Design a protein with these regions (language model features):
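Short beta-strand elements
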Residues: 120-124, 137, 186, 195-216
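N-terminal beta-alpha lobe that positions the nucleotide/phosphoryl donor
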Residues: 1-183, 190-192
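Short conserved micro-motifs at the rims of enzyme active sites and ligand-binding pockets
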Residues: 129-130, 195, 219-224
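Conserved catalytic alpha/beta cores of large enzymes that bind or transform nucleotide phosphates
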Residues: 211-233
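Low-complexity, compositionally biased segments
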Residues: 107, 204, 229-231
Length: 233
């Protein structure tokens, strides 16, 4: 059976082309002894296999065989593409691989049915384009194994929302350029959360900018609250 999943602790999680940017960064945090909730990745190759075995890939290729149309037409194509992904059956071996990884995660957590978040983790092949996490709809929350295959397909389908298509079109989008994995990670209730990123400083180097909020970072991602902001030399 093909390997459809990679745990964040496994060496394969170093490969952005397999696990996507977000999962790769989580693996690096683990390597540096930073505490990260347990999880695994449904690999980018799994999406390729799903599209091929379900017939969805041929339907999507037909939809995107011409240049993307104007706004109204784009909305129609987007809806058809999303429906194609969500309406296609996942093969038994792919579903079994994903459920098997979830059950292994449950044993790690000593929990019968761990609550997990299921965002998409994208890499552009072969590193031609920047990565913008906020472009994609994300983070379904699953409470047991029965909804997991649906959540994974929803993550894949987020590649074909109008927002995603506009972004891809703006950077010279091609179907073959996009490789998307799905991160399945134990969902915890944080006391505080946030994001950290680098920004140029006045001397030509980089400082670290940290934006933090109480509770979940979802409020920060959606712009609902004003974060505490710190700049570190």
């Amino acid at each position: 059976m093909a390997k459809y999943t990679v745990f964040l602790t496994e060496p394969e999680a170093l490969d952005v082309d397999i696990v996507g940017k977000e999962a790769h960064q989580l693996h690096l945090l683990l390597e540096n002894a930073v505490r990260v909730p347990d999880g695994f990745v449904v690999t980018a190759d799994t999406l390729h296999d799903f599209l091929e075995t379900s017939g969805a890939g041929a339907k999507l290729a037909h939809l995107f065989s011409a240049d993307l149309p104007e706004e109204r037409g784009l909305e129609i194509i987007s809806r058809q593409a999303v429906e194609t992904v969500l309406g296609s059956e996942m093969s038994w071996d792919i579903e079994a691989g994903i459920i098997g990884a979830y059950e292994h995660l449950a044993r790690q957590q000593s929990v019968g049915a761990p609550k997990v978040s299921v965002p998409v983790s994208v890499a552009f092949h072969p590193d031609r384009f920047p990565y913008f996490a906020d472009t994609f709809e994300r983070r379904a929350t699953v409470h047991d194994r029965h909804d997991l295959d649906k959540a994974v397909k929803e993550a894949w389908a987020s590649l074909y929302t109008p927002e995603s298509l506009r972004f891809f079109n703006s950077i010279g989008w091609d179907l073959e350029d996009v490789r998307a994995s799905v991160l399945v990670q134990h969902n915890i209730a944080p006391e505080a959360s946030g994001v950290a990123f680098t920004v140029p400083d006045e001397e030509g180097g980089h400082d670290m900018m940290i934006k933090a909020v109480l509770g979940s970072a979802m409020a920060l991602e959606k712009g609902i609250v004003e974060p505490d902001t710190y700049r570190v030399d």
